[in-house]
Amino acid sequence: MKINTALILCAGFGERLNPLTLKTPKPLLKLKDITVLESCINIIVKLGVKKIFLNTFYLSEQIFDFIKNKNFPVDIKIIQDGDEILDTGGGIKNMTNHFQDNDFLIFNPDTLWNTEYVEEINRMQDFYFLNKLTNVL
């Protein structure tokens, strides 16, 4: 079995990276020629995930525009956190109100993801389903 839904946490202010994040949301910062968000989406695609839910709050219009202008080979739905920042737990809970799957992966786009993680994440999924666990960190 494989997990078909992924959540990407993109709502934060990125304060530790000021002044870089004063006008650009942290997920859209670039390393070389790729944003950290795009790097995250690319690994999720390699995992075979069918649907991505991405939450936004700070400078959300930039994230909306970025996703709209890219042609990612996966269905991406953007969820606005609302009138106030919900923090990590609130953002996850808010996104889970928009889908039915009980099993999902959660990604922080400020982690530098590369293809070497695909095998490790797949092993975690296998372990999760084999042992009928509630969650795996």
Language-model features, listed with the residues they occupy:
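Short acidic/histidine- and often glycine-rich active-site loop of Leloir-type glycosyltransferases
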Residues: 19-20
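Conserved beta-strand scaffold positions in the cores of enzyme catalytic domains, especially
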Residues: 28, 78, 135-137
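Short catalytic helix/loop segments, enriched in acidic residues and glycine
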Residues: 23-38
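Conserved G/P- and acidic residue-centered "switch" motifs that form tight phosphate/ATP-binding loops
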Residues: 12, 26, 110
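Glycine-rich "HGGG/HGxG" loop immediately N-terminal to the catalytic nucleophile
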Residues: 14-16, 131
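Conserved N-terminal catalytic core of the sugar/cofactor nucleotidyltransferase
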Residues: 1-8, 16, 34-108, 114
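Conserved donor-nucleotide/metal-binding helix-loop-beta segment in metal-dependent transferases, i.e.
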Residues: 115-137
